[in-house]
Amino acid sequence: LLFEKSYEYGEHQGLGFVQGEVCPLEPDLKDPALKVPQIGWNALHILRDDPLFQYIQEGEYVYYVHSYYGRHCTASTLAVSDYSIPVTGVVRAGKVYGTQFHPEKSGDTGLRILKAFAEL
């Protein structure tokens, strides 16, 4: 919804807050451990410092449940996780933030991210 375009259930225009598109997750399926949808915990790798991360450390784990991910959004990407490909974890465009993972299901790490968001 936040991106310019999505290919989830057809091709659709988004709101365009974030440059890029939402595409099907296509990890290296030669690895039998990698499934789609991805359901589980992955380390969050912070690419750019941001107040959203003030209460977490590099590499803390967050919980994903998804079959799609944002791509071609390098300018807006704040953090990624690895699923044989870099999966966009957090984007920001001005005052608009989005997460691919579920902060509300990410335990203490997610609560600290939500705390930082509430303080923005």
Q: Where are these predicted regions, by residue range?
A:
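Cysteine-nucleophile active-site neighborhood
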Residues: 1-38, 115
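Active-site oxyanion/phosphate-handling segment shared across diverse enzymes
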Residues: 41-101
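Acyltransferase
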Residues: 101-120
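Phosphate-coordinating loops and pocket residues in cytosolic domains that bind phosphorylated ligands
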Residues: 4, 93, 119
